[in-house]
Amino acid sequence: MLRSLIGSLATALAALGALIGPAAAQQQPLRSECLAMASRPPLAVPVSLRRTAAKAEEVAITYVGHSTYYIDTPGGVRIGTDFNGFYRTGRLPDVVTMNRAHSTHYTLSPDPKIPHVLHGWGENGQAAQVSTRVGDVYIRNVPTDIRRYYGEDSSGGMIRDGNSIFIFEVAGLCIGHLGHLHHKLDDTHFAAIGRLDIVMVPIDGTYTMSLDGVSEITRRLRSAVVLPMHRFATPLDEFMRLIGQQFAIDQRSERTLKISRDTLPGTPTVIILDGV
């Protein structure tokens, strides 16, 4: 009798564990590898292993236009940054991120066939909170303030947490898109961003922020690859002068950069893709 009771209890507990286990796993917060890597020194990898792994871990980044880059992951996920529906090439993205500064950085009527639409702003004055995994990429945001335009009210001030920097973690790479950034970043922002191997930076010098300001951010991030965007008529020489001689410059004749964790340049490099 006692054995039978114990056996029944064990069976019931096992069944309960099977039900609770998946739910508990879903509630576990997603972990940022880029924040973890920022807090520890880089590990040396033998050259032979780097060469073997590079092809399998390659990410393709294509300049589409304005502030829109397409990021194609090894797992087949396509991401479109600052997606507005106008700047497109090839198949639709699986994920789109948006900033709400102007209509060229977002759309409220995206193609319904895009399964994941991520806004850089929240509702009712709240900051956006993005922490999601799609296929082989983990996507998160760091809220930033956005300029309030005089057409909206009489203040012309800033909307706290009204926009976002988006960070994409895939194939061992930390890729950041600064969006339509309107202000300098403080220590809290840099801590929340963590390590960025590749960063997409607006260099218009007016609509977002001054070239001095964005150059200071670029220097502090010290990413291996800097991809300019939102250029308009900004002379590239002026941007390069401001960010300093510690950055190399690499001007390409193609729109797509294929890169892996192990093919990042040893010297921080501004890579200017065709069309920028």
Locate the predicted segments by residue.
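Active-site-proximal loop/helix segments of hydrolase catalytic cores
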Residues: 148-221, 232-238
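Bacterial N-terminal signal peptides
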Residues: 8-19
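Metallo-beta-lactamase
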Residues: 20-148, 173-178, 197-201, 230, ...
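Positively charged n-region of N-terminal signal peptides that target proteins for export
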Residues: 1-4
